[in-house]
């Protein structure tokens, strides 16, 4: 793992509604590189194609010489809480293996976190297997009980598959 900062890195936000097939292909390639499990590949392809219908999703892409090396998606998604409705979800955060440790993930996530506070982007709520990374950027773990309103058969089932659910900013109460 190289420690330092990736050179010639270009970070851009693209509205999902206008993502080209070429860029989407790069996103799918990076998702599969990050999560290579066979069963998960098929599920990820389906989810990626299904997400194409979501006109309010944005993709933050980190490029080096026209190669996608980092990615995150975010979208306004309403979540009802005891204190009212909050909105924003972060998903599909990944960095290609040889660029890990070079500030690519940090730059992508800082770009997304900078959007918090904009209309319909109250907080960033997400799941992760690497909570320490996000804690350094101002997020914290939450232990709230979640009810999955889209799962009519078992709404009490945990809607998250990763162990840690986090929220940004860490001051959100």
For the regions a protein language model found, what residue spans apply to each?
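Conserved N-terminal entry element of GNAT/NAT acetyltransferase domains
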Residues: 1-25
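A conserved beta-strand-loop-helix scaffold within acyl/acetyltransferase catalytic domains
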Residues: 16-17, 24-94
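Short loop segments at secondary-structure junctions
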Residues: 65-66, 98-99, 169-173
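Short coil/turn motifs at secondary-structure junctions
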Residues: 77-79, 98, 131
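A short, internal acetyl-CoA/4′-phosphopantetheine-binding micro-motif in the GNAT/acyltransferase core
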Residues: 90-101, 129
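Conserved acetyl-CoA-binding loop-helix of GNAT-fold acetyltransferases
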Residues: 95, 101-114
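Conserved active-site alpha-helix within GNAT-family acetyltransferase domains
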Residues: 118-123, 128-155
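C-terminal "cap" of GNAT-fold acetyltransferases
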Residues: 149-173
């Amino acid at each position: 793992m190289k420690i330092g900062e990736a050179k010639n890195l270009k970070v851009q936000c693209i509205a999902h509604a206008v993502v080209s097939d070429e860029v989407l292909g790069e996103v799918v390639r990076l998702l599969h590189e990050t999560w290579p499990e066979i069963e998960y590949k098929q599920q990820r392809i389906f989810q990626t194609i299904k997400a194409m219908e979501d006109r309010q999703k944005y993709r933050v892409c980190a490029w080096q010489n026209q190669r996608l090396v980092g990615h995150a998606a975010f979208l306004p998604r309403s979540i009802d809480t005891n204190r009212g409705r909050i909105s924003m979800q972060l998903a599909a955060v990944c960095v290609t293996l040889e660029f890990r440790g070079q500030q690519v993930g940090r730059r992508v996530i800082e770009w997304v976190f900078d959007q918090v506070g904009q209309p319909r982007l109250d907080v960033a709520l997400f799941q992760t297997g690497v909570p320490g990374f996000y804690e350094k950027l101002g997020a914290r773990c939450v232990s709230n009980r979640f009810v999955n309103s889209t799962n009519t058969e078992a709404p009490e089932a945990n809607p998250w598959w990763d162990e840690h659910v986090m929220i940004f900013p860490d001051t959100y109460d």
